């Protein structure tokens, strides 16, 4: 009997060329978006000196992404998915060019930043939805879990590298360089995506989009197991919105512009480690309990983050949050795929992604509001410990999720 490895199996990148192209495009895209993610809050903080305004930008972008995910789900089921992906990526690049040109003005427009955030959030989510819908055709349904873990690792590694580069660019060239390179990277992603095969939508009866979405909502509300997983995912994403406080906390810790990048890189770094060492997660006998406990630990890490006397200790707390949130997220993904009926998988995955975006937007708005009334340190701690209390209550209430057991799959030589 072969012992299951802790490490993630990357063989899909060798055996599936189309998935390899998506992997490359996604990595470049994440690096580009990371440059943007550092520049926007820092620019708004410098222009307004208001954490509320920083939170508002994240909230508006998150709202646009939510709408884009809903619209994108309909488009991906009715039109050729490769075309939807390419159109969405190219349109996003145009928005990044607009941010670059705005940053070069003597007096950049705050309204333009907000509007372009809406633009990019909407079109970016169109591409995400189409790519999610196309993934089974690219890798085969039997490889979806492995593809999901590789995708998480790609996103996290890119998110580690890009904030560090973004911080250095801020210290040397200003936000315009961040926006310009983000636009260039986005257009470069079109090259590997052009090699994808045609991805036509599956034949299906015509149904009003709202009716289909309502059926998905009803399933979530009726299933304490799947609904509980979705609720935990939303709360976990709310906690990650602590990044809107990074610029203000950086001032409190007297960090340089280059050091700010370490704050943005810490969570992705921890999550990358979590994804890379996720080989045994799918074999957990009680994944629901493990999901709940890892989520509670993540909330505790955020509560302690703002209390740290030195920024390097804060980075450690953020990395711990990233690792625990990766464990929880991978378990959420696995259980959603196995506990959701085949006919509901598309809608439930879309709604799960959308509620994560919504949780991020709500968390950003709440933290921005807290930042206007409290110190950044108090805001970060209040959010973390508040979510921890809610998490403990859910640990007691979500009985079916807590007690859920599964039979570990058989380990073969190819899995080791």
Swiss-Prot record:
Membrane topology field: Multi-pass membrane protein
- Transmembrane segments annotated in the record for this chain: 22-42, 56-76, 84-104, 110-130, 157-177, 179-199, 219-239, 257-277, 288-307, 314-336, 357-377, 379-399
**Cytoplasmic compartment residues:** 1-21, 77-83, 131-156, 200-218, 278-287, 337-356, 400-416
Residue ranges in the Periplasmic topological domain are 43-55, 105-109, 178, 240-256, 308-313, 378
Gene Ontology MF, one: enterobactin transmembrane transporter activity
What Pfam family is a match, any one?
Answer: MFS_3
Q: Which CDD domains match?
A: MFS_MefA_like (cd06173)
Q: Which UniProt keywords apply?
A: Cell inner membrane, Cell membrane, Membrane, Transmembrane, Transmembrane helix, Transport
Please state where this protein is localized: Cell inner membrane
Give the source's domain of life in one word. Answer: Bacteria
Q: What does this protein do?
A: Component of an export pathway for enterobactin.
Q: What is this protein called?
A: Enterobactin exporter EntS
**Lineage of source species:** Bacteria, Pseudomonadati, Pseudomonadota, Gammaproteobacteria, Enterobacterales
């Amino acid at each position: 009997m072969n012992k299951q490895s802790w490490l993630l199996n990357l063989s899909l990148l060798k055996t599936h060329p189309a998935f390899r192209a998506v992997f490359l495009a996604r990595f470049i895209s994440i690096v580009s978006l990371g440059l943007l993610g550092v520049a926007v809050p820092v620019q708004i903080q410098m222009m307004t000196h208001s954490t509320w305004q920083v939170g508002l930008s994240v909230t508006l972008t998150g709202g646009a992404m939510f709408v884009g995910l809903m619209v994108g789900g309909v488009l991906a089921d009715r039109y050729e998915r490769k075309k939807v992906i390419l159109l969405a990526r190219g349109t996003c690049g145009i928005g990044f060019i607009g941010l670059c040109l705005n940053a070069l003005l003597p007096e950049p427009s705050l309204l333009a930043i907000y509007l372009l955030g809406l633009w990019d959030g909407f079109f970016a989510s169109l591409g995400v939805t189409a790519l999610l819908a196309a993934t089974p055709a690219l890798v085969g349904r039997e490889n979806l879990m492995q593809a999901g873990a590789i995708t998480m690792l790609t996103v996290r590694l890119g998110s580690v590298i890009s904030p560090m580069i973004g911080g250095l660019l801020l210290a040397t060239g200003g936000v315009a360089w961040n926006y310009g390179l983000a636009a260039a990277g986005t257009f470069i992603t079109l090259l590997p995506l052009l090699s994808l095969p045609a991805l036509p939508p599956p034949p299906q009866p015509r149904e009003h989009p709202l009716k289909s979405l309502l059926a998905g909502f009803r399933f979530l509300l009726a299933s304490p197991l799947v609904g509980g997983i979705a609720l935990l995912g939303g709360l976990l994403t709310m906690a990650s919105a602590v990044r809107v406080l990074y610029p203000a906390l950086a001032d409190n810790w007297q960090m340089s512009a280059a050091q700010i990048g370490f704050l943005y890189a810490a969570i992705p770094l921890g999550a990358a480690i979590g994804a890379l060492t996720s080989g045994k997660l799918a074999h957990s006998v009680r994944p629901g309990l493990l999901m709940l406990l890892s989520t509670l630990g993540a909330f505790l890490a955020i509560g302690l983050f703002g209390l740290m006397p030195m920024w390097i200790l804060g980075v450690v707390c953020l990395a711990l949050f990233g690792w625990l949130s990766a464990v929880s997220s991978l378990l959420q993904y696995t259980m959603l795929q196995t506990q959701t009926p085949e006919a509901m998988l598309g809608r439930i995955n879309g709604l799960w992604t959308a509620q994560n975006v919504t949780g991020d937007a709500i968390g950003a708005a709440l933290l921005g509001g807290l930042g206007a009334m409290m110190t950044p340190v108090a805001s970060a701690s209040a959010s973390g410990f508040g979510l921890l209390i809610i998490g403990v209550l859910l640990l007691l209430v979500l009985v079916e999720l807590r007690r859920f057991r599964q039979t570990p799959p058989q380990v073969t030589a190819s899995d080791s």
